[in-house]
Amino acid sequence: HVKYHVDDPEELAMINYTSGTTGFSKGVMLPYRALWGNLDYLIDSVKPHIGKNCNILSTLPMAHMYGLMTEFLFNIVLGNHIFFLTRLPSPTLISEALSEIKPDILYAVPLVVDKIVRKEVFPHIQTNRARLLMNMPVINKRIKEKVREFVLRKFGERPYEVVVGGAPLNKEIENFFISVGFPIAMGYGTTETAPLITFAHQDNYVAGSCGVAVKHMEVKVLSDDPENVAGELVCRGINVMKGYYKNQEATDAVIDKDGWFHTGDLATMDADGHFFVRGRSKNMLLGPNGQNIYPEEIEDKLNSMAMVNESIVIQSDDKLVALVHPDMEEVNNLGFTDEDLENIMEQNRKELNMQIPSFAKVSRIKLHNQEFEKTAKKSIKRYLYQNAI
């Protein structure tokens, strides 16, 4: 008798490893149903807008589920043209590739989007004349349309939308995109969900939100008052993994008896089902009277300030200290001395503390000469710097 293969949605499709942001990587066992669940959502929500025979520029690592699903598997299914970079991606290389390939949709991490906007866009539109024109009600709309067209050219002219995932988008960049009507989208997920949990396309984008639950997934916040008090974001559905490879203890720690996967992320949820991730529960710090401090929110503000390339906020002896890697290219271009840089950072610290609650004030800024070590999805490996003071 001939034995034919019987399709089983629970069959193991792949083992993908977590990015290791908070520690060692774990092997995530993803069944075919999880891959299908993600593809079914993308086909429903993205395919009608981009169709077939599109150009896709791959800027994300294929070893990470975000890139593997959105850039590779989804577009293989659609039969699109995928262009791979032949060198390690840098903002300059990506900018060149965008202008040449003109992708129909772009998937990226916030770091890349941030660099393109700050290097290629802001220097042209943050002149006194441009600011004056954008603030004049009579011509404001026309100017913003021109700015939108200019920004689109920097992202390849014709993307249906630019999808940001892997980490939150910087608030300054996000507000700029919204103000000029740029087609920004946001996805949120984990390796354990292959990867999508929530998504916001440009037509239902809400500032600060990572979107609403995707098709096939239930998502909720474990809080008595989820609109105002952050709780852990949990999800359940066909996108969820089978478990961690040869690690039942770790599996049981994140998937409860009712099938809910515990992400470890703290979030709130508004009345319309939009989720707002505040930070990782493992990263959350406690203020002097037990207040919750989310270092990611402080870092987001600090990263928009003068001469700051990236930062990490850590706690040392009950005080908050910001480790800052300066934008050395800008520092050198302007001819700043070490003393100049120290003075700028102190001014940054004072401005930062005016924008945040008193219990979350940063006591000092310490300069970090090298870029912080990152995962494949460009998230800083925070655990390496907890004892850096």
Regions inferred by a protein language model and the residue ranges of each:
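Conserved ATP-binding/catalytic segment of the ANL
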Residues: 220, 227-287, 304
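Conserved ATP-binding loop and adjacent catalytic segment of the adenylate-forming AMP-binding
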Residues: 83-85, 162, 169-231, 239-242, ...
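Conserved C-terminal "lid"/linker of ANL adenylate-forming enzymes
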Residues: 285, 310, 318-321, 349-389
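Conserved AMP-binding A3 loop
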Residues: 13-39
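C-terminal boundary motif of the adenylate-forming
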Residues: 266, 304-328, 353
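Adenylate-forming
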Residues: 240, 274-303, 329-340, 356-362, ...
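Conserved AMP-binding/adenylation subdomain of ANL enzymes
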Residues: 36-55, 63-149, 158, 183
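Conserved pre-ATP/AMP-binding loop-to-beta segment of ANL
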Residues: 1-17, 24, 49-55
